[in-house]
């Protein structure tokens, strides 16, 4: 009669298996017990409440230049200060609006950049 293995002993046995052997074991386990090893994904609630919660949890923001306004030269200067772009690249970015100026930055950095751009006369979105 086989002895019952503890969780620790089972884990030690799994550690000794190669990756291929472990994958074969998982497949056999799934077939034997009619289960899958895929992680369960929780369904997100729909509606405006979910959108508000997602906005609160967001930690990376994009600063989108939507228009240069009347003071295009000032906006180009601010874009150059915020990014490491050269004069031509910054001008192309401003001329090609709407375009992202900064991507995946912290909320504080995004707000500060948006204020700088708005101060220069640009219209900006933070997403």
UniProtKB/Swiss-Prot annotation:
**Which Pfam families does this one have?**
Ribosomal_L12, Ribosomal_L12_N
* Assembly and oligomerization: Homodimer. Part of the ribosomal stalk of the 50S ribosomal subunit. Forms a multimeric L10(L12)X complex, where L10 forms an elongated spine to which 2 to 4 L12 dimers bind in a sequential fashion. Binds GTP-bound translation factors.
Q: What is this protein called?
A: Large ribosomal subunit protein bL12
| Entry's family note | Belongs to the bacterial ribosomal protein bL12 family.
Which keywords does this chain's UniProt record carry? Ribonucleoprotein, Ribosomal protein
Its BP terms in the Gene Ontology are:
translation
Q: Which organism is it from?
A: Streptomyces avermitilis (strain ATCC 31267 / DSM 46492 / JCM 5070 / NBRC 14893 / NCIMB 12804 / NRRL 8165 / MA-4680)
Q: Which NCBIfam families match?
A: L12
InterPro entries from the xrefs? Ribosomal_bL12, Ribosomal_bL12_C, Ribosomal_bL12_C/ClpS-like, Ribosomal_bL12_oligo, Ribosomal_bL12_oligo_N_sf
- Give the gene symbol: rplL
What this protein is reported to do is described as: Forms part of the ribosomal stalk which helps the ribosome interact with GTP-bound translation factors. Is thus essential for accurate translation.
- Under the cellular component aspect of Gene Ontology, which terms does the record hold? cytosolic large ribosomal subunit
As one GO molecular function, the record gives:
mRNA binding
Coiled coil stretches, renumbered: none
Q: What is the lineage of its organism?
A: Bacteria, Bacillati, Actinomycetota, Actinomycetes, Kitasatosporales
